[in-house]
Amino acid sequence: MGENEDEKQAQASQVFENFVQATTCKGTLQAFNILTCLLDLDPLDHRNFYTQLKSKVNTWKAKALWHKLDKRGSHKEYKRGKACSNTKCLIVGGGPCGLRTAIELAYLGAKVVVVEKRDTFSRNNVLHLWPFTIHDLRGLGAKKFYGKFCAGSIDHISIRQLQLILFKVALMLGVEIHVNVEFVRVREPPKDQENRKIGWRAEFLPADHALSNFEFDVIIGADGHRNTLEGFRRKEFRGKLAIAITANFINRNSTAEAKVEEISGVAFIFNQKFFQDLKEETGIDLENIVYYKDSTHYFVMTAKKQSLLDKGVILNDYIDTEMLLCAENVNQDNLLSYAREAADFATNYQLPSLDFAINHNGQPDVAMFDFTSMYASENAALMRERQAHQLLVALVGDSLLEPFWPMGTGCARGFLAAFDTAWMVKSWDQGTPPLEVLAERESLYRLLPQTTPENINKNFEQYTLDPATRYPNLNVHCVRPHQVKHLYITKEMDRFPLERWGSVRRSASLSRRESDIRPNKLLTWCQQQTKGYQHVRVTDLTTSWRSGLALCAIIHSFRPELINFDSLNENDVVENNQLAFDVAKREFGILPVTTGKEMASTQEPDKLSMVMYLSKFYELFRGTPLRPMDSRRKNYGENADFGLGKTFFQNNYLNLTLPRKRTPRVDAQTEENDVNKRRRQGFNNLEELPAFSSRSLGSSQEYAKESGNQNKVKYMANQLLAKFEENTRNPSALKQDCPRVSGMGKPVLCSASRPPGTSHCPKLEESTPRLPPPLKRQFSSTVATGQVLRELNQVPASGECPGRPWRARAKSDLQLGGAENLATLPPTCQGALALSGVLRRLQQVEEKVLQKRAQNLANREFHTKNIKEKAAHLASMFGHGDLPQDKLLSKRVPHAHPPSPPSCLPSPDPAAAPSPPAADSVSPARKVLTVGKVSSGIGAAAEVLVNLYLNDHRPKTQATSPDLESLRKAEFPLSLGGRDTCYFCKKRVYVMERLSAEGHFFHRECFRCSVCAAILRVAAYAFDCDEGKFYCKLHFAHCKTSSKQRKRRAELNQQREEEGTWPEQEAARRDVPAESSCAVAAISTPEGSPPDEPISPKKSKSVPKPNSRPMEVEATSPRPSEWTSVRIGPGQDGQDVLAVRVLVTSEDSSSDTESDSGSIIGPCTEACEERPRLPESPPLSQPLTRHISLRETLTQPVSLLLHHKEPQAVPGLQRAYSLQSPSKYQNWRRKFQSNSTPMNQRALSPPKEPPPSSSSSSPSLPSSFSSASVPGHTTDDSSSPQVTYNLHSPQISRDDVSPTPIYLRRARAQGITKEIPLYLPHSPMLESTEHCLVSPDGEELRSPEEISASDGCQKALALGNSESTHKDSYPVSGKDPYLPNQMLALGAAGNTGDLSEESRMGQTGGAELSKERKLGLKKLVLTEEQKTMLLDWNDYTQEHKAGERLAQEKAENGRGNSLKPICSSTLSQAVKEKLLSQKKALGETRTPAAKAPREREVPPPKSPLRLIANAIFRSLLPSSEAGKKTSSKPETKTLPRGQPHAFTRSFSFRKLGSSKDGDQQSPGRHMAKKASAFFSLASPTSKAAQASDLSPPNPILRSRSLPNRPSKMFFATTSLPPSSKVEDVPTLLEKVSLQDAAQGPKKGASHISPLGLKDKSFESFLQECKERKDIGDFFNSPKEKGPPGNRVPSLEKLVQPVDSTSMGQVAHPSSTGQDAQAAVRTQAGKEGSSLVSSLVLVSGPGAPVTEDTSSPTSSSAEEDVETQLSSRLKEKIPRRRRKLEKQMAKQEELKRLHKAQAIQRQLEEVEERQRTSEIQGVRLEKVLRGETADSGTQDEAQLLQEWFKLVLEKNKLMRYESELLIMAQELELEDHQSRLEQKLRQKMLKDEGQKDENDLKEEQEIFEEMMQVIEQRNKLVDSLEEQRIKERTQDQHFENFVLSRGCQLSRT
């Protein structure tokens, strides 16, 4: 009997094993039936089945499975299987979600029946699994059923395998599963309940199935999108036609197949090149593709219909997708070929054979289906009650929420819904009221579509049925019971169809956008806003707006700083309208619906267009209290938020509702009081304006004095005018009696409404040079002074009143003329005319003063010139001046601008002016401001003088309106068809369907790429000005071929030949070309450009101002809907800095740009040879993409705060090309070592004989910068004066302004700091040169070696421009790429003593140092040996360390303040003496270290990225191994007792500048700054024992650049001051270190969810970083945050174990070496970060700064240690770590993919919704316009209201589309960064000794590009965070407003 039992047990075990390993549905059921029969189990006994089965099958394999299932069943929610023991459930559908729901209900103890209409699991399609899904399935024993389940990094499984796993688990838990049974419908309980209580049943096929009598209480629909359960309405999410193709190929599991990489997904939105290549090679056009390797090779792709038609897959094109994809319309053979071709290309033809797998029908497993529409149920559950029987109806899986397949959300969200449904059943079974059950379920369902792997709880072990364990911040009561009453369906409700009840008891939510809006309400609102404005009387929505004044008044009422309303002329309709259109477009993102010309040409504007346009203002500003007239002045006082403009503009498309907080308008005041009070306020403030302007714009004291004199004249004039006004009888009467005196009674503020600083902006029209501008005027185009700049740019033209800047009110006085006017005017008006005569006389005096000053300036300039310059100047004055000037004009005006004389700066057309719309009038004003300080610039002195001469001898020009019109930008030319004609198809385009870009209007469908015909988006396109064509970003690079480049160059050369005698002088004198189009190289985007200056698409920035600064470049931000192109021109007063739009402008200007690119970027002698490479660079990626609202923040920054004459075009071009040119840093190190010393010598010495190319340079300008690229080799082209940079050195500055005040003023002037800190190498030569100025925001100017790059434009365009770098610090893409060599002359020359003493004597006297610094130019003579020593980057001396300590002490003393630039001229004597003493004290120890490099010249040059490499390598090693390695060679370093230990706080992750400045710092700078900090911080790892060769940088330099480039040795004692903001260091570490990948998700930008949700704010993340105890916490999540006090001694704790003594005492390496290593190892182990361990291990014993250099063999010994490190890497790096890193990288890639797919899908849905609303809008518009037969039969008011709602809906969709595009851009950057990181890691895994020059260059290039991407991402994240903060603030304001009205605010 015992034998029989044993045999039976063995047999049962075998059958159970067969059941577990069964691979088909039928086989599983068969094995299960055999098992139950064998063990005498009753499957229908669901309560006891599992326990009986477990007791009878007890093999070791089975026990492991029972353990898994028991652990799951032990959750308290199940109550040991008794929670729902009385509930019967029917589940329709045996898919993964249905089975998972059945398992949960079985655990609850319910009776569960599953019906499945099939008996096979044949779907090989692969599902992506979220981490929690994998964990959940493992908890169910998935690994026991399927051994390959998620092995390694696999995170997907085929549907078939998943179904089998869940199928078997459900059977074991007692779930009753019926196959081949189809559910038909639910049968209600019969009415006759007396005899027998019969509840809810179902009808099945076959009809006689036993289940037909099964009564159930709960029915759950899990039958996919068929959704056979009634009562659930579905919402359709319709995108573009999406045809999905799935293909399964046989997997033979061969070695070749195993090597093929899977494709987690390729999203079109950030990998377009892949799809373009696929289309070009195969003709297959896809939107995405995924490849998973499972039991088959599974491919799924989304194909475009046209591609399928072209390839013959679809035979005929039908609109109906069902007909389109029906079997009769599909060629199966072509479909197979299509799928195979796509799979081959996607896998790079690596799969040896692609034979199709066979599906359950015996056919090749290829399917094509429609994913155009996705559906989601409006509700997740409902309750039915009949005959006292309740039925709970629920949906799960695709029935509930249909997934978009590329996102991989189907299974994950399906499982979550299954848990939520089981929780609902449990609640209902326990007696919870039905409405509460439904309300809770709906609350959870609202969360479901938003779930992502990132925003659900990460502790998967705690997951239970309870939703609180899965959803963070859960609110189960967000839906109230009364809101789901319609879901409880009883007999009494039968008469109400379900559709009706869908709207019953809907909550009365208050939403700003949902409130009732009618056109008459819009009219009333407009009347309120324009009340009190002269000549503005709004009575309707058509004619009242024709003059443009009403539009300007609306803008002025909310943002008075944007428009100078006083200066507007009522009769100038075109200008007024265009001004309003341009300002609204630039500031608010409101695109124009017409043009100024069209408004002027029609008597009555189109009503619908005006309603649509005005509705956007209404939507933007409604609910905003009116601004009181008299309070406007105070809004722009010292505390004004000048930064609002930029952030407002950057985010205007994201959210057009950003009202400024204003106090209510006080209407009680009389008009007279208003006028007089405002006038008096203007007078009282006039005296304050110059000082404030000087402060806000960084103007010099000298200019403040000059402006004070000027303003005295203005002040007197205004006082007279004010006195006159006060004596008049009544302003209102004056308005009636004297209507033509337009300036008298306007309720517009003169100076009061203007931001301070514009007092220096006279509204002058004549071309005579006048007042010098503020010294740093062009630097004001930053956020801080953005408003000021805007006001400056928007002073409209007034040709009749040339010299009256502040007398806007009396402008019309001067326009009055003729006796007839006098006769008809009342006495007061005649008095006004008399007063105007006084004003004229005052003006004449003013003009004479200005002319005299300009002449004196010209004389001074002339006498400072050399012979050639004087000759050129004289020649230009006597007969030859016209030639070059005309040439300049012709070059700079690609469009048909009349070549006005050079002395008169042609006013740009306001319709297209890159500056604010009134730029045409701004030009003269700017011109006046730009003359005086031109003398301070050296770049183009000759041309300046020529212009000055011509200006002084030309009659004043009166710019008539026709002239202005001809000079206006042709943004909206009428010749293009006007607003009602599509630019492409030339057909009618109605208002609702009208899109606009580049001044053209078109249909959405017509907006296509000229090459590939892909539909473009208004937020992302490229435009060719010449051809008038639009391109996608991929094809824009090809729009100008190399032949056209050659053609341009040929034309340029021919033009130069024709000009005969002028080539040399012209090359030397020429300004920067106005428009640089270098088709690809010039493509950049102005991150740093101010939002207040958009570039207009058609306007040529080419007009050369006579007084313009030589290298001024206009950087303007494109309007929200457009791309940017590079326009490099002598901008207007430098206020528009580097307009960047992706355009190819005229051939002339492009050619000029190419020819001048060398001089633009720097004196590159190979500019001509390098130019052809520019357009041939690889296709653009992210930098080209322009997005609607955050264009400035998404892409490469543009330098705005360069020095007075620095070319602001340089950084933009440089970064633009850098991303395209992988070879941009070729030869950078070789060039540096070969050129930097000679270049520095030249920089420090005056030119002995200036070459012809530098003829225009001032004698004080060293020739090194004009021809420094290749010594002795110069070309005219490459050394034009534009390359000279004015650094305001004493030798070159005419205003006696020292650099320090300049920078201090500049610090005050700029509202935000520079975007990217500049890298400055630690080379001893460079470190000892004081050439790196750091502005208070930490901005550094470029180092000299970067200028010396000799590979032409390509080198000059290098983004980071770190032609030299040091092991210790790595280049971060810089903002100001080039070090002006005047600063070399000032700073580097000043440090000649430092250089020479470091290289030779090692000492210098303080007097000598001071003297040499004052000399400015002194030649440095070095021997070859000394040069070699200086250029050896490993050469460090004791002197450096002492100097660095000194610098650190200095830095520590001023820790809380902004870091002031320390110029040589301002370095205090005390500091010099202290430095001298330090050097003397260490002089004796310097020699051995200095000799070390020469003793080890044999090894190959080290990789510039070796520090990062070794840091990451160490992070791969276990901490113990790293500890052993380091401790094997203890370092002998001592800290002399007598030396201070200022280094303990030397390095800190902090912003530069005060808290105020810090708050304004751009996020981009932080990323790059912290990037530099990180790699310096990581540096100890790289040279484990080379510290004896390493010395910190020069103390003076250190004091400036410390926060940007911390020294290696400072790492061990890094501290985090409480005030510091640890911004983006953790982010960067996560991006660059391998360690982080295994420890948690990325922070920063990566957590932007596709739905616009953020899991955790970036600010909170930074706060956490601050609170971490030490640097190790940067690599770990802060689970235990220390008290605030722990923030300061961040690293000191970490270092204390290294040395038992205090930091100030002597550390004895002999006693602390090994112990310290062990202690640090222990500490690092606690931190859990091997990277931190390695960092501290290296720097631990070396924490004391000073080394013991007595051992001459230390260098070689340390080299041995490094060699050992490299050799042991391959041996010690565990495979598991590599696997883990690979897995984490793949997971991150998958996250990005799914986000991208979601964004892509949502974009398509938005596009469809837009199309639908446009169709409806056009229909309504036709009716309203009377174009249909039934037009007169409908109520116009009702139609207009309906149409208006459609307009608002379209506006919202456009904003949403913009936000999606921004998210796509962020993902693109993230993906690009990840790929760069992986590539960099692969490069660094190569042994150092095996690397050649190319490897080093590639590493450098990759790193530079990665830093740029990091910076862009960080900037974007910060911008989005700011936007969210604003939105929250606005929402709070709105809620307060609603609550104040006594309303209840409920959210639905």
UniProtKB/Swiss-Prot annotation:
Residue ranges annotated for the LIM zinc-binding domain, each copy included: 980-1042
Residue ranges, compositional bias (Polar residues): 693-709, 1233-1243, 1277-1292, 1580-1591, 1698-1715, 1747-1756
Essential cofactor(s): FAD
Domain notes: The C-terminal RAB-binding domain (RBD) (1796-1945), also described as bivalent Mical/EHBP Rab binding (bMERB) domain, mediates binding to predominantly RAB8A, RAB10, RAB13 and RAB15 (in their GTP-bound forms).
EC identifiers of the protein: 1.14.13.225
An annotated GO BP: heart looping
Region of interest (Interaction with MAPK1), residue spans: 1300-1339
Gene name for this UniProt entry: Mical2
GO CC entries: actin filament; cytoplasm; nucleus
Protein's name in the database: [F-actin]-monooxygenase MICAL2
Biased composition annotated in UniProt, kind: Pro residues: 896-917
Gene Ontology molecular function: actin binding; F-actin monooxygenase activity; FAD binding; metal ion binding; mitogen-activated protein kinase binding; monooxygenase activity; NAD(P)H oxidase H2O2-forming activity; oxidoreductase activity
Binding-site positions, FAD: C97, E116, K117, R118, R123, N124, N125, F183, Y298, D398
Region span, Monooxygenase domain: 2-494
Family: Belongs to the Mical family.
Keyword presence, Flavoprotein: yes
